[in-house]
């Protein structure tokens, strides 16, 4: 089966080359027909799991489409070449081609397709190169934002923010979360704004910037419904505990369901939050100590003894 598909692919390549040849009666290459044959060759090689040959066929198809000024189809072919590289576990090279495809989609006036390609590239590279994935998600968010598709934009910004937190790039994470919060405010999704304020505060406290954390809460009072919400009360309690270096109070807040059931990356920030100087523990109630022999009874004991024989 594989051998048959490989032969089929080679036949399509040969046909494509013929379409590109010029002669006495054919002055211009037939790029459209050549691109079609290269595409068929790529499919045949892919079915035979010959990904290197499939990738090469896709690249030739892309060039043929470019020569024919068919940018959208050229971009599709570059994207397919990228997916062949993904099958070969060559992820950075795959992302490079998918990025190229997305730029061509934009040039062609199809921003939605460009954004989807960039997001796909981000997912591919996320575990290998988180920094690159952040860049791709931010690019995707910008494309969606330019198209006024704010819900899609903020979703991608959220992915970027979580990756920044995971990589402990807190300065960048703080800016990214603020951008998310601004968009949620614009689309009037106020409850999510409250959650983003919690995320902001945790990030700022991990940056050891209490002033910025407090400012976030203060600025959020202008968001409808925030003042008086459980999010607001919890944050005020958290900041109070942090300011007073009360580790117990901080831990109690960060272990509450409100914090524990946030996105995993933010929940971890809460659980790992330590107040400056290591914090102080609340004093546990003093346990009554045994009285040494010969020590006089307390006033309460004496009072009890006084009436032990009754009132008469």
Swiss-Prot record:
Coiled-coil residue spans: none
Primary localization class, coarse: membrane
Positions of modified residues (Phosphoserine): 284, 308
InterPro entries hit by this protein: NSF_attach, TPR-like_helical_dom_sf
Subcellular location(s) of the protein: Membrane; Golgi apparatus
Start-end of Acidic residues biased regions: 300-312
The keyword Membrane appears for this protein: yes
GO MF annotation terms: soluble NSF attachment protein activity; syntaxin binding
Membrane topology note: Peripheral membrane protein
A GO-annotated cellular component: mitochondrion
Record text on subunit structure and interactions: Interacts with RAB11FIP5. Interacts with VTI1A.
Family as reported in the entry's similarity comment: Belongs to the SNAP family.
Protein name: Gamma-soluble NSF attachment protein
Gene: NAPG
């Amino acid at each position: 089966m594989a051998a048959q598909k490989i032969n089929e692919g080679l036949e399509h390549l040969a046909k494509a080359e013929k379409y590109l040849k010029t002669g006495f009666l054919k002055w211009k290459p037939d790029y459209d027909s050549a691109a079609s044959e290269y595409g068929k060759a790529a499919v045949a090689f892919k079915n035979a799991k010959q990904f290197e040959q499939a990738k090469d066929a896709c690249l030739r198809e892309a060039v043929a489409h470019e020569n024919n000024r068919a940018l959208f189809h050229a971009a599709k072919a570059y994207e397919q070449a990228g997916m062949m590289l993904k099958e070969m576990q060559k992820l950075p090279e795959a992302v490079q081609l998918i990025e190229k495809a997305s730029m061509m989609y934009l040039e062609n006036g199809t921003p939605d397709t460009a954004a989807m390609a960039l997001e796909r590239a981000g997912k591919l590279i996320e575990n290998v190169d988180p920094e690159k994935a952040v860049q791709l998600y931010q690019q995707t968010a910008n494309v969606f934002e330019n198209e006024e598709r704010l819900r899609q934009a903020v979703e991608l910004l959220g992915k970027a923010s979580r990756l920044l937190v995971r990589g402990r790039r807190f300065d960048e994470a703080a800016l990214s979360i603020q951008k998310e919060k601004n968009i949620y405010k614009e689309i009037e999704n106020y409850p999510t704004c409250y959650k983003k304020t919690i995320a902001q505060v945790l990030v700022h406290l991990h940056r050891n910037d209490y002033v910025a954390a407090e400012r976030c809460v203060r600025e959020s009072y202008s968001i409808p419904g925030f003042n008086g919400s459980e999010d607001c009360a919890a944050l005020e309690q958290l900041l109070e505990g942090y300011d007073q270096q009360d580790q117990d109070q901080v831990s109690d807040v960060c272990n509450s369901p409100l914090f524990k059931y946030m996105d995993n990356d933010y929940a971890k920030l809460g659980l790992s939050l330590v107040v400056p100087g290591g914090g102080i523990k609340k004093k546990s109630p003093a346990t009554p100590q045994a009285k040494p022999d010969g020590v006089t009874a307390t006033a309460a004991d004496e009072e009890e003894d006084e009436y032990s024989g009754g009132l008469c």
